[in-house]
């Protein structure tokens, strides 16, 4: 997501002296970045440390502004308050349409100098560029490509069930029934709207990337109101029967811990969940299995953490470009994403340092990018503006919690999206 650079205040006189005299290279000792983000879980914090250390090695100090909440909603609330008060952070982790909203307001800086010099356009996938650029100019530095259509399975529980990874809906249900028979919670889930929507993302994608695109990216009323969408809601109702009684409000990383500890069989979550497994000392293929949600093989729904750079005074621009360059360097892209659990935001980063899940993520992204099936995630702000996303959230969560039938959910979905456009 996105962060901005700011020279630390040294006192009015000292700052004036630096601004007047110090060229780019000599300003580094006094550079500071205040970073607003929501990377607060163990795995995420470890990944963030990679970025902190990388910037510190370049003479850029770090002022942390963590705001808990995996979907970033709370962080955006804090950001709006800061900007309204005329005190925007220098760097902000952002997703998709949130970036575009700030760009439309003329609030973001210009990274064209470094992007052009380093050839970002050739190595960053086009679907990411749609958000990292505005009006033809680079405004954000993509850090990674997270994909949301993953399953994280406890290996011991899977082995007890026969060891076969499910490849379709019927096999998934059979596996969940087996987990229930084993006496563990079949699905580890946190009852928060963005988590409900993350599952729905994968369920809808399992009906094919063309249907997903029509429904969630094109917002086609026929697709949104179709019998296929009703089937998707029916499947959500079925999956709801496999969560535990205490799921409401649970944070996503606590759901990951249930799978890690063998208390649950599977979690449907983006690949940031892998960071939790690694933090707990677990190994892919030995302790847990990573696989695409059944029926979504060959397609990837993504979100991308980006650092959006807000407009700063001219003397601070070099520091901003230094940070952007550091984020996009292949060495950093590899080191950071190995820890974060995501794929690099560049397609030319070697997979050498990545584990089996990381190698699969990189290969899947390349395949989807080449096939045109690398699609923005509805649940994570890369398919629709916030108003539409939140309207979908509301319907999905109410249906998942039994407040709407599938038939009524389809009708409400069409109406809610139309009203939010």
Swiss-Prot record:
Listed Gene3D superfamilies: Periplasmic binding protein-like II
GO cellular component entries: periplasmic space
InterPro entries according to UniProt: Bact_solute-bd_prot1, SBP
UniProt keyword annotation of Transport present: yes
Family to which this protein belongs: Belongs to the bacterial solute-binding protein 1 family.
Protein name: Probable sugar-binding periplasmic protein
Secretion signal span: 1-27
Note: Immunogenic in cattle.
Pfam families to which the protein is assigned, alphabetical: SBP_bac_1
Localization in the cell: Periplasm
S-S bonds: none
Function: Part of a binding-protein-dependent transport system for a sugar.
Keywords: Periplasm, Signal, Sugar transport, Transport
Species the sequence originates in: Brucella abortus biovar 1 (strain 9-941)
């Amino acid at each position: 997501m996105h962060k901005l650079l700011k020279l630390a205040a040294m006192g009015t006189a000292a700052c004036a002296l630096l601004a007047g005299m110090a060229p780019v290279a000599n300003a580094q000792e006094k550079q500071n970045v205040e970073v607003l983000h929501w990377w607060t879980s163990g795995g995420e914090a470890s990944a963030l440390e990679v970025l902190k250390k990388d910037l510190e090695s370049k003479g850029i100090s770090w002022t942390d502004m963590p705001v808990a909440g995996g979907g970033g909603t709370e962080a955006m609330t804090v950001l709006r308050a800061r900007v309204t008060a005329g005190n925007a952070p220098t760097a902000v982790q952002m997703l998709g349409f949130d970036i575009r909203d700030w760009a439309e307001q003329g609030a973001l800086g210009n990274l064209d100098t470094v992007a052009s010099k380093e050839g970002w356009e050739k190595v960053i996938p086009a679907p990411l560029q749609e958000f990292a650029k505005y009006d033809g100019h680079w405004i954000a530095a993509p850090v990674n490509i997270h994909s949301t259509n993953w399953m994280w399975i406890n290996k011991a529980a899977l082995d007890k069930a026969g060891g076969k990874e499910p490849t379709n809906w019927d096999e998934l249900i059979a596996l969940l029934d087996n987990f229930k028979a084993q006496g563990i919670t079949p699905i580890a889930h946190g009852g928060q709207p963005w988590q409900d929507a993350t599952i729905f993302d994968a369920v809808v994608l399992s009906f094919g990337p063309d249907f997903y695109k029509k429904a969630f990216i094109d917002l086609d009323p026929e697709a949104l109101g179709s019998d296929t969408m009703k089937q998707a809601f029916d499947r959500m109702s079925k999956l709801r029967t496999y969560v535990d009684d205490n799921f409401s409000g649970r944070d996503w990383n606590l759901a990951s811990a249930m799978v890690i500890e063998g208390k649950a069989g599977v979690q449907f979550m983006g690949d940031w969940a892998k960071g939790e497994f690694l933090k707990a000392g677990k190994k892919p293929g030995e302790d847990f299995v990573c696989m695409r949600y059944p029926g979504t093989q060959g397609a990837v729904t993504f979100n991308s953490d980006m650092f959006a750079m807000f407009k700063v005074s001219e003397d601070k621009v070099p520091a901003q470009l230094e940070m952007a360059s550091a984020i996009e360097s292949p060495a950093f892209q590899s080191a950071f994403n190995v820890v974060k659990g995501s794929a690099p935001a560049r397609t030319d980063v070697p997979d050498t340092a990545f584990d089996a899940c990381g190698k699969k993520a990189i290969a899947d992204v390349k395949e989807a990018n080449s096939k045109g099936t690398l699609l923005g995630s509805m649940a994570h702000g890369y398919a629709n503006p916030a108003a539409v996303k939140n309207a979908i959230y509301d319907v999905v969560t109410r249906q998942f919690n039994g407040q709407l039938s599938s038939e009524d959910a389809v009708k409400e979905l069409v109406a809610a999206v139309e009203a939010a456009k």
